[in-house]
Amino acid sequence: MNCGEIYRTQEKIPERGHKPGFYVIVSREFIASNDDVSTVICAPVYRETLGLRSEIVVGVEDGFPQESAIRCDFLTLMLKSKLTHFVATLSSEKQRQLNRALSYALQLTV
């Protein structure tokens, strides 16, 4: 697993209305790719876009069935074993957008 990869869960998740969902890994590479670490931090993907600075819009070209939003305000810790279906990897541009959205959501200044 790597930062910027998109996965779909098979399990129905209570926080998602008991439906499977899409998640983007946002953990740093050392954590995401380390087989000894069982969890990663993920940003959930929602079908509804709200136009927030803390979200980025993605679509079919990014591996999603329809236009959706990666929401950085709702980061969640996921077991790697629940991220069962690899979908795609974000493009370099989408990764830059995600980094800006994460920075905004977490109020980080560099």
Enumerate the predicted regions with their spans.
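C-terminal terminal-subdomain/extension
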Residues: D62-V110
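Compact nucleic-acid interaction/catalytic patches
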Residues: R16-V60
